[in-house]
Design a protein with these regions (language model features):
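Intrinsic-disorder-associated, low-complexity terminal segments enriched in Asp/Asn/His/Tyr and depleted
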Residues: 5-8, 12, 17-19
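Short, conserved catalytic-motif segment at the N-terminal edge
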Residues: 34-97, 118-121
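Active-site SXXK
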Residues: 44-51, 70, 93-120, 196-201, ...
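A short, polar/charged loop-to-alpha-helix boundary motif
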Residues: 82-91, 402-414
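Flexible glycine/proline-enriched surface loops and loop-helix/loop-strand junctions
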Residues: 89-91, 175-182, 192-194, 279-288
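Active-site helix/loop module of the DD-peptidase/beta-lactamase fold
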Residues: 90, 95-99, 113-155, 173-174, ...
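Active-site-proximal alpha-helical segments within enzyme catalytic domains
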Residues: 145-146, 192-199, 286, 290-312, ...
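Active-site Gly/Thr loop motif
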Residues: 241-296, 328-387, 423-436
Length: 436
């Protein structure tokens, strides 16, 4: 794994003012299998919730890592890599789907922080061929906050299109936007792999996967890959898809995808060129929106510097100003054009997604504190940084849950973490520090 022997992925810098105790070793047998790891006693509520996910919420295999002020306070894993399969081990990794977007966004912010990329500049300054079919005025920032108007492609994609980077770049260059860039907000579920990835490529001279490996994963010592080397394939837990129930069929996103044949939602759901997230082709491809492969330590380790002003253990990834930009909402809508729910994004990061108005989806929203930012992945994986509490959080799993991206397994762990910090829930959909 990348630098795994060099440093604890979640950091190891202690801070006395949190009154944290020494972590205790965990080894618990549940109905879903063995749970192992370590946990600070102050976060026993998080441990209990992790156990409940296996006992009550149909968890199969999962990992959870939380750091506070650079110190790992929760590091848990357990369950099975497949139904009836081997135990989920400390080094098991899995596809984190759109939680990859946070890693891609960080790369873009690093390029901007180095003066290589200007978020206020036209895209065509860096990528001239992008300025076709009504996209000539698009700004770089629009590529990051899902407002550029390319949530998907209309023409049927060839088999394996997502694995062919240059092919996808050419299609996006020629595609007419679904709306005038900057005027609406619609989740770019897969296409941001190439819109954001190519901005990193054009500004730094490195493809996204290589930039991430060289400038982020290796220096941090995290087990996180955008383009997985073949030798790590045996560690990957396959993703188990949620069954299609009547509740899923009757959801707003499913109804729109089925009934509105020329909508962004329809193309997002059905035009995927036979994409298979469990294939070696998907794992090897540098799809910076969807096929990052990691575990909870990798996700929490990615966000640990961002929860601490851009620096961890003497390694500075970005400036404090860059972290502030990541935290500030860039665009918000009451109905995302693609997802058909309220969403809020900063430049490249998700701030909130609100499923609370949907039937049987009260616990399938992303509810974090107002300064926090990160990204959810399909099925429920999640990573985020909270600069106010200096907490970083990572959760991965292999049995995908119901709901649009988020589900109650991941959100219940987030809720437990904030409660352990003394936060209280707000009806508006954020966690608030009770001590402030």
């Amino acid at each position: 794994m990348t630098g795994a022997d060099k440093r604890d992925s979640c950091g190891d810098r202690p801070k006395a003012d949190r009154n944290l105790m020494s972590n205790k070793t965990i080894s618990l047998t549940t109905s879903g299998g063995l749970i192992e790891g370590e946990c600070d006693p102050k976060f026993d509520g998080v441990l209990q919730t992790f156990v409940e996910n296996f006992e009550k919420r149909d968890e199969l295999g999962a990992s959870l890592c939380i750091s506070l002020e650079g110190r790992t306070i929760v590091d848990l894993w357990g369950g099975k890599v497949a139904p009836g399969g081997a135990p989920w081990s400390r080094d098991t990794i899995s596809v984190v789907f759109s939680a990859t977007k946070g890693a891609s966004a960080l790369c873009a912010h690093m390029a901007a922080d180095r003066g290589l990329l200007d978020f206020d500049a036209p895209v065509i300054r860096y990528w001239p061929a992008f300025g076709q079919a009504g996209k000539e005025a698009a700004l770089t920032s629009m590529m990051l906050d899902h407002s550029v108007g390319l949530p998907h492609l209309r023409a049927p994609l060839k088999k394996g299109a997502f694995y062919d980077y240059d092919h996808m770049i050419g299609l996006l260059e020629r595609e007419e936007p679904f709306w005038r860039p900057g005027t609406r907000n619609g989740y770019h579920g897969v296409t941001s792999a190439w819109t954001v990835g190519e901005m990193v490529h054009r500004s730094t001279g490195k493809r996204l996967g290589k930039f991430f490996r060289d400038e982020v994963a290796t220096p941090l010592g995290i087990d996180f890959w955008i383009g997985l080397p073949a030798e790590h394939e045996p560690r990957v837990a396959p993703m188990i898809f949620a069954p299609v129930t009547d509740e899923v069929r009757n959801s707003r996103i499913s109804q729109a995808a089925t009934d509105e044949k020329d909508s962004a939602t329809h193309y997002f759901m059905f035009n995927n060129g036979g994409f298979n997230p469990n294939s070696r082709e998907a794992h090897a491809a540098e799809i910076g929106s969807a096929t990052g492969i990691s575990n909870a330590r990798g996700l929490a380790g990615l966000y640990a510097p961002l929860a601490n002003g851009g620096e961890l253990n003497g390694l500075r990834l970005v400036s404090r100003d860059a972290v502030t930009r990541m935290s500030l909402c860039s665009i918000a809508t009451h109905e995302d054009v693609t997802l058909r729910i309220p969403t809020r994004f900063s430049l490249g990061f998700m701030k909130a997604m609100d499923n609370r108005g949907l039937e049987n989806a009260a616990h399938c929203s992303l509810i974090i504190s107002d300064p926090a930012f990160g990204h959810v992945g399909a099925g429920g994986s999640i990573g985020f940084a909270d600069p106010a509490s200096r907490m970083s959080f990572g959760y991965t799993m292999n049995r995908m849950g119901f709901g649009i991206l988020m589900n109650d397994r991941g959100q219940s762990l987030i809720d437990a973490a904030y409660r352990a910090l003394g936060y209280r829930s707000d009806a508006g959909g954020v966690w608030i520090d009770s001590n402030r």
